[in-house]
Amino acid sequence: MAQSKPVKKIVLAYSGGLDTSVILTWLKETYGCEVIAFTADVGQKEELSGLEEKGIKTGASKVYIQDLRLEFARDFIFPAIQGNALYEMRYLLGTSLARPLIAKAMVEVAEKEGADAFAHGATGKGNDQVRFELGVKSLAPEKTIIAPWRIWNFGGRSDLIEYAKSKGIPVSITVEKPYSMDRNLMHISYEGGILEDPYREPDEKMFLLTTSPEKAPDAPEYLELDFQEGNCVAINGKKLNPYEVMEALNTIAGKHGVGRVDIVENRLVGIKSRGVYETPGGTVLFLAHRDLESITIDRDTQHHKDKLSIEFAELIYNGHWFSSRMKAVRAFITETQRYVTGAVKVKLYKGTCSIVGRKSSVSLYNPKMATFEKEELYNQKDAEGFINIYGLPAQETARLRKK
């Protein structure tokens, strides 16, 4: 059953594929209202030409296709890198970062068009339904949200195909891939189908962004990444905007097989899910940025930030991009990045990204203090008093418990 609350105009997150094409027609049929299709270009590399015509033929009153690649890199990927966001210590959150941006853009279209409802094609078992809907609830709490997969009676792909045929929906019926794929500027994710067996190795033909490490170039490639306040602004001296940085690093690091991850992660809804990810550019940025922090942020601030990065990643993964807690966490992260300026030299070789050098005009690393040679600034005799005070709790605990 559909929601009882009447709606007048719906903005649908639309890809032009089987699911959202069926949803478009089903929404019009079920709610008897105008449906506006919205497509975001977040670097998925899909053919977007002809999508507007397809949406209109399927029944959309209007089709919006927005290029959000620069905004995605600048306002979502780069802040995640600044915060060292890594979910469960392994996942760089590519899909999680794109969803709040799409929700934000859909809200803007809804306000422009006077729409009072949103619809999406996320299933009731995944994380994306939460991310989309929390985004809308945070930005447009008065709007209605429609999630067809939680409402209708279609059981799966075969039911959708039959419905599409019966309604004359213009979709190309192809052999279903043995897994699902989601691509954007940050990564490509693969899950489901044959990948549901966590012991089965992925087929090498599956990977689109990265060369097999075994077949990667036999010579390493070195890059110098320039950072300003935690953001990469140049590669090998060439100034680039955030979108260009991601495009360049995806190509270069992908050629060397960098950024493959095969994990089982804990979904927000409580299900464990196997995911295989290609994140070449994001991997290089993550490692280089964290390394630069090691010479530009003091110890106590860095340690606290490292702890907060776990919470930051969970907030992103769980769809809380626009929450008050996220704003507070990001404010702290932004403050820590004031001096994260400098250059990092990385070495790419057969699936690995190694940091081989770093420098900064505001570095806290003092070779005169760190030297193993005759010191000028550090008096080793001072260490004895420090250790006596620092070790006092341990010493007293041991002494008193021996009584």
UniProtKB/Swiss-Prot annotation:
GO terms for biological process: argininosuccinate metabolic process; L-arginine biosynthetic process; urea cycle. L-aspartate binds at T123, N127, D128. Keywords: Amino-acid biosynthesis, Arginine biosynthesis, ATP-binding, Cytoplasm, Ligase, Nucleotide-binding. Pfam families: Arginosuc_syn_C, Arginosuc_synth. GO terms for cellular component: cytoplasm. It catalyses: L-citrulline + L-aspartate + ATP = 2-(N(omega)-L-arginino)succinate + AMP + diphosphate + H(+). Its EC number is 6.3.4.5. ATP binds at A13, Y14, S15, G16, G17, L18, D19, T20, S21, A40, G121. It is found in: Cytoplasm. L-citrulline binds at Y91, S96, N127, R131, S180, S189, E265, Y277. Coiled coil: none annotated. The keyword Amino-acid biosynthesis applies. HAMAP family: Arg_succ_synth_type1. Belongs to the argininosuccinate synthase family. Type 1 subfamily. Homotetramer. This is Argininosuccinate synthase.
